[in-house]
Regions:
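ER/secretory pathway lumenal C-terminal domains and tails of membrane proteins involved
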Residues: 1-275, 281-353, 358, 364-430
Length: 430
C-alpha cells in the first residue's frame, strides 16, 4: 500500500518471508559454531589464500522492469553465505568477536586453551574458550542474569529500575528480607538515598514466588480418590498431565527463548519483556497455590471456612505487589518520549521542505509517534540513516509522506536496488 510507515515494505512472498523471518538481524550459532576468538577458515585458490564460505539458499527479488510493459518476474540477486571457522564448539554461547572483553569480564577471566591454526601454511596458536568457559557464561549471564533476574523481579522483588550491566547496585533482584539481600547484593541500607528511594525499588518478600511454588507442586501431585472395579479405593494422579501443559508454556516462553536468542553482554536495554509469557504461566501456578492452601485447610476447618481463609490470606500477596509497584508502573503524566520528539520537530524550520536526520530507534520513534499519532509537524521528513542503506527505505524517501514532499533523490531504482551496484569502484584502475 506504500503507506508512510512501511517497515521493510513486504510487498511479495519473498520480502514478506524476509520480514517475518527477521532476516535483517542476521543469524547466531545455536547448536554448533564459532567462538568469539575463532579465526576464519582459509583455503588456497590459484596460489592465493581466500576465506572458505558456504553458499546457502538463493535470495529472490522482484526483477526491476526496464520498461513498463515488461512482464513481472523474479531473479536471484545473490546467495546467502556463511563463513566457515577453523575453531568451533558445541552449543556456542560466546560467539561474538565484538564482545570478547565483555565475555571475559562476566567470567572474571577465561581459562581458555591454545589450539593450532593453519594460516595458509603458517601455523599459529589461537587461544579459544573451553567448553566449560562456554557453559559457565551460559549459566552466569544468559540464564541467571538475563532470565532468572527478571523472573525474580516479578515474584521476589526488585532493587531499582536503573538498567544494570552486572553492577551490584543497579537492577538486581532482592527480597526485602535484610539478611537474604545482604547475602545476595550486600547491605541495602548503605545505598545512597536516591537508590533507596527509587520508585522501582519493590519488595515482595518472595511471597508470590512461594505461592507459585505451592501451586506448582499441588498441581503436579494432585490426586483423586477413585474406586476400582473390585471395590478398592485408590488415589489416582490427575494433576501431572495438566502440570506438563503449564510447564511447557512456562518453558517455551521463557528458557527456550533464552536458548534461541543466545544474547551477548551489554544489551542496549533490559529484556524482561521478551519473557512475559513465562511470567504469565507462573501466575497460573500462583492461582493454583490458593487452591492448594484451601485444600490443605479443608481437612482441618471444613470446605467453606478453608476457602474463605485461603482467599483472604492469599489476597495480601497481590495487595503487597500493587502497593509496591503502582508508582513505577503508573504511566499517567509520563510524556518524556512525546516531549522529546515534539521538541526535536519544533526546532526544525517551517519553510523549505525540512528534513531531520536520525540514527537508531531511540532518536526516531518519538518523532514517528508525534507525526503518526498526534499529527504534529507532518511537513517534516524524518530520515533514519540506519535504514538509508536499504533499497526499500530509499523507495520511501522518494515518495510523499503526509505534508512532506518526496526527497529529491535522482537515482533510478535500477541503480540502488539490491543486487545492483553493491560494490562501486571509485578507482577502476586498482
Amino acid at each position: 500500500a506504500n503507506t508512510p510507515m512501511d517497515q521493510n515494505s513486504p510487498e511479495d512472498i519473498f520480502t514478506l518471508g524476509e520480514y517475518l523471518g527477521r532476516e535483517q538481524y542476521g543469524t547466531r550459532p545455536l547448536f554448533y559454531g564459532q567462538t568469539y576468538a575463532s579465526k576464519p577458515a582459509l583455503k588456497e585458490v590459484d596460489g592465493g589464500c581466500v576465506y572458505d564460505v558456504t553458499e546457502g539458499a538463493p535470495v529472490y527479488q522482484r526483477k526491476e522492469k526496464a520498461t513498463p510493459d515488461e512482464k513481472d518476474s523474479y531473479e536471484v540477486v545473490r546467495h546467502k553465505t556463511d563463513y566457515k571457522y577453523a575453531q568451533n564448539m558445541l552449543f556456542p554461547r560466546m560467539y561474538s568477536d565484538a564482545h570478547a572483553q565483555a565475555y571475559e569480564d562476566w567470567l572474571g577471566g577465561i581459562k581458555g586453551v591454545q589450539v593450532p591454526y593453519d594460516q595458509c601454511g603458517q601455523m599459529v596458536m589461537v587461544k579459544v574458550p573451553t567448553q566449560w568457559d562456554n557453559i559457565k557464561f551460559f549459566f552466569i549471564y544468559q540464564l541467571n542474569y538475563m532470565y532468572w533476574r527478571y523472573f525474580m523481579w516479578n515474584f521476589a522483588g526488585r532493587q531499582n529500575d536503573i538498567q544494570g550491566q552486572g553492577e551490584i547496585e543497579h537492577g538486581n533482584w532482592i527480597t526485602g528480607i535484610p539478611f537474604v539481600d545482604k547475602f545476595l547484593v550486600g547491605d541495602q541500607s548503605l545505598l545512597p538515598s536516591d537508590l533507596k528511594n527509587n520508585k522501582g525499588h519493590n519488595v515482595f518478600y518472595c511471597l508470590p514466588l512461594i505461592l507459585g511454588l505451592i501451586g506448582l507442586f499441588w498441581q503436579a501431585y494432585k490426586t483423586k480418590r477413585i474406586t476400582t472395579p473390585n471395590g478398592e479405593e485408590i488415589e489416582e494422579p490427575v494433576g501431572i498431565q495438566q502440570f506438563w501443559i503449564v510447564f511447557f508454556l512456562f518453558f517455551m516462553t521463557g528458557l527456550a527463548i533464552v536458548l534461541y536468542l543466545n544474547q551477548t553482554p551489554m544489551q542496549p536495554r533490559e529484556r524482561d519483556y521478551a519473557y512475559a509469557g513465562s511470567f504469565y504461566a507462573f501466575a497460573i501456578w500462583i492461582g493454583m497455590g490458593v487452591a492448594g492452601i484451601a485444600q490443605w485447610l479443608q481437612g482441618k476447618l471444613g470446605e467453606k471456612p478453608a476457602s474463605v481463609i485461603a482467599t483472604v490470606v492469599c489476597l495480601f500477596v497481590p495487595i503487597q505487589m500493587v502497593s509496591q509497584t503502582w508508582d513505577d508502573h503508573d504511566r499517567s503524566n509520563r510524556y518524556v518520549a512525546r516531549d522529546f520528539g515534539q521538541n526535536y520537530l519544533s526546532t526544525v524550520q517551517e519553510e523549505g521542505n525540512p528534513i531531520i536526520f536520525t540514527n537508531g530507534d531511540n532518536d526516531t520513534f518519538p518523532l514517528w509517534y508525534n507525526q503518526e499519532t498526534e499529527g504534529f509537524r507532518t511537513d517534516v521528513r524524518v530520515c533514519n540513516l540506519s535504514y538509508l542503506q536499504t533499497d526499500w527505505y530509499i523507495d520511501q524517501m522518494k515518495r510523499q509522506a503526509y505534508d512532506s514532499p518526496a526527497v529529491p533523490i535522482e537515482w533510478s531504482r535500477l541503480e540502488y536496488v539490491q543486487g545492483h551496484n553493491e560494490g562501486v569502484a571509485v578507482r577502476p584502475e586498482v
